[in-house]
A protein has these predicted regions:
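Conserved ABC ATPase "signature" region
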Residues: 103, 107, 114-132
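A short, proline-enriched helix->beta-strand linker immediately N-terminal to the Walker B motif
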Residues: 155-159
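Catalytic Walker B motif of ABC-type/P-loop ATPase nucleotide-binding domains
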Residues: 161-165
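ABC ATPase "signature
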Residues: 220-221
Length: 260
């Protein structure tokens, strides 16, 4: 990591309610430059809500947060200029070609496409999409759409990346290329905030992980730190995740099968 003291994501008591339901409960979180931070949790735990607030797409009910040094509530445009956000599923314009979509993304960020076209070409080649970028997006497979969206996310060289399931729909070779790319970006000082259900990816890529359950951040740390907190010896991240979030164990699964 480039500078472990450069704070790029800072949330204090970040809260979100929808009616009477608390989707996020007083989240405190710090993420640093050059860090790949895994954000993990069961479906409905609050991961997407958190990401949407940190990217300025959803207004918090309470608390505060800053990304890349800018307040998400009072300086959302400055935040958006410095981040890249890959949603799951990604939103693409189907009646544009891949190139036209990337030109549109560059225009949104106020970046002349000529200044980033070489970067776009290199990323397209890395993800093996360069021969199809002239085709309409409506004809793309799920994996091709994911690749194009990722190139768009990286096009303006953002300081902080928010990635929701970045390897979804990718073949093993492309998934490996994406993982290697993210590691290199972190090595160059970028912050990668990664939400994934593939715990093996988080275990092998992330410097630290945060586990959220029912809107509460219940654990934060490196794998070794989480093992120590849970007194779990050499447990895998998957075992720790299931232990902390109350997932079914082997005995419970066997009981269900025997009863059916």
């Amino acid at each position: 990591m480039t500078d472990p003291h450069e704070l790029t994501i800072n949330a204090e008591e970040l809260t979100k309610t929808f009616g009477s339901r608390k989707a996020l409960r007083k989240l405190d979180l710090e993420v640093y430059a050059g860090e790949i931070f895994g954000f993990l949790g069961p479906n409905g735990a609050g991961k997407t809500t958190t990401i949407r607030m940190l990217t300025g797409l959803l207004k918090p009910t309470g608390g505060e947060a800053a990304v890349a040094g800018f307040d998400i509530a009072t300086q959302p445009i400055e935040v958006k200029r410095r981040i890249g956000y890959l949603a799951d599923p990604p939103f693409l314009y189907e009646q544009l070609t891949g190139w036209e979509f990337l030109e549109f993304i560059a225009e949104l960020y106020g970046v002349p496409f000529d200044s980033v076209s070489d970067r776009a070409q290199r990323l397209l080649e890395l993800l093996e999409l360069d021969t199809r970028v002239g085709e309409l997006v409506e004809g793309y497979s799920h994996g091709m759409r994911q690749k194009l969206a990722l190139v768009g996310t990286l096009l303006h060289d953002p300081h902080v990346l928010f990635l929701d399931e970045p390897t979804a729909g990718l073949d093993p070779r492309s998934a490996r290329a994406v993982k290697d790319l993210l590691v290199e970006l972190a090595r160059r000082g970028r912050t990668v905030f990664l939400s994934t259900h593939i715990l093996e990816i988080a275990q092998h890529m992330c410097h630290r992980v945060g586990i959220i359950n029912e809107g509460e951040l219940i654990a934060v740390g490196s794998l070794d730190e989480l093992r120590e907190q849970a007194r779990a010896g050499e447990a895998s991240l998957e075992d720790l995740f299931l232990e902390l979030t109350g997932g079914a164990d082997v005995r419970e699964i066997a009981d269900v099968l025997e009863a059916s």
